Design a protein with these regions (language model features):
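Conserved catalytic-core motifs of GNAT/GCN5-like acyltransferases
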Residues: 120-124, 135, 140-156
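A short beta-loop-alpha structural element at the N-terminal edge
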Residues: 2-16
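Conserved active-site alpha-helix within GNAT-family acetyltransferase domains
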Residues: 97, 101, 113, 126-144
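Acetyl-CoA-dependent GNAT
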Residues: 8-9, 22, 34-93, 104, ...
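Terminal substrate-recognition subdomain of acyl/acetyltransferases
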Residues: 154-178
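Conserved GNAT acetyl-CoA-binding A-motif
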Residues: 104, 111-122
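Conserved beta-strand segments that form the floor/walls of ligand-binding pockets within enzyme
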Residues: 59, 71, 85-89, 118-122, ...
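A short, aromatic/hydrophobic, helix- or strand-capping loop or linear motif
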Residues: 26-33
């Protein structure tokens, strides 16, 4: 298993990964068949993302297949350049193998290099596997968005979670064990 930064050459495989995630889990934003991006559009998005100093996508690769990703999307204005919003997706067949931990460790290494001080995410309140990973990685719940998602005919709450990175203030860095 290899965790690395995304490249433009990953465009087709990244779309395939996202489409698989849309099919197999209800915890992602898009319903199956709502994803309409082309390979060229994805290449442009990746190129644009990589040109932004405070945004990145890390992918987990197994024998040439993308099996997970973590996107970190930073703001463009001065007052929020220190924070990123995170989106994570890992194929169900690969959960419980340390991939999430590996993705977050890469995120934290990168964050230290580019000066990210705060990481934020949302997670559906009933996503126990996601919640466990995020808590393991040091995130805490900061709020609840009531009825913020509509899934399978029901409104679902989301937790707002965040982690403040201490090394951004004092130079220390802590790796998490896989």
């Amino acid at each position: 298993m290899k965790v690395r930064a995304i490249t433009e050459d990953d465009s087709r495989n990244y779309i395939d990964l996202c489409e698989k995630l849309d099919q197999e889990t209800k915890f992602m934003m898009l319903e199956p068949d709502e994803r309409t991006i082309t390979v060229d559009e994805q290449k442009n998005r990746i190129q644009s993302l990589l040109s932004n100093e405070n945004s990145m996508i890390f992918v987990a690769e197994d024998n040439g297949e993308l099996v997970g990703y973590l996107g970190a999307y930073g703001g463009n204005v001065q007052r929020i350049k220190h924070r990123v919003h995170i989106v994570v997706g890992i194929l169900q067949a690969y959960t419980g193998r340390g991939i999430g931990t590996g993705l977050f460790n890469e995120l934290e290494k990168w964050s230290m290099q580019v000066g990210i001080q705060r990481m934020e995410l949302t997670v559906m309140a009933h996503n126990e596997i996601g919640l466990a990973l995020y808590k393991k990685m040091g995130f805490s719940i900061e709020g609840i968005a009531r009825d913020s998602m509509f899934v399978d005919g029901k409104y679902v709450d989301e937790y707002y979670m965040a982690k403040t990175l201490p090394y951004a203030r004092n130079g220390n860095y802590i790796y998490f064990n896989e």
